[in-house]
A protein has these predicted regions:
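Charge-rich, N-proximal long alpha-helical rod segments
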Residues: 1-11
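Structured alpha/beta interaction-core segments
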Residues: 14-107
Length: 107
């Protein structure tokens, strides 16, 4: 239980690293990526895994939190993931934090 609390407190720092990486993605030696990998390696030792979500994957409320919808005329895209705005994580197979996603909604 103490590990879970500590890890939850650390997730915003991982989010900040993700944001920094996205803003510096074209730099050759991005130190933020090294820091992120090191932090994820530590988390992995305690059973933390990133929830993998692919673009156009069907929305799954057991792993995702829909924070917004994107209207589309394509009915095949309805309820599929448009974008991941915040990564989700599991701890020993249980959701620690749901991934925040934008989901298509057919008009």
């Amino acid at each position: 239980m103490a590990n879970e609390k500590l890890i939850k407190e650390m997730l915003p720092y991982l989010d900040s690293l993700d944001l920094a990486i996205s803003h510096h993605s074209n730099e050759k030696n991005n130190g933020y990526e090294v820091l992120r990998k090191q932090l994820l390696d530590i988390f992995a030792k305690f059973g933390v895994k990133e929830i993998e979500i692919l673009a156009l994957e069907q929305f799954d409320e057991s792993r995702m939190n829909a924070i917004m919808t994107m209207t589309t005329k394509d009915k095949n895209l309805h309820n599929k993931v448009y974008d991941v705005t915040k990564k989700g994580y599991t701890l020993n197979g249980n959701v620690l934090r749901y991934a925040d996603v934008v989901v298509y909604s057919a008009a």
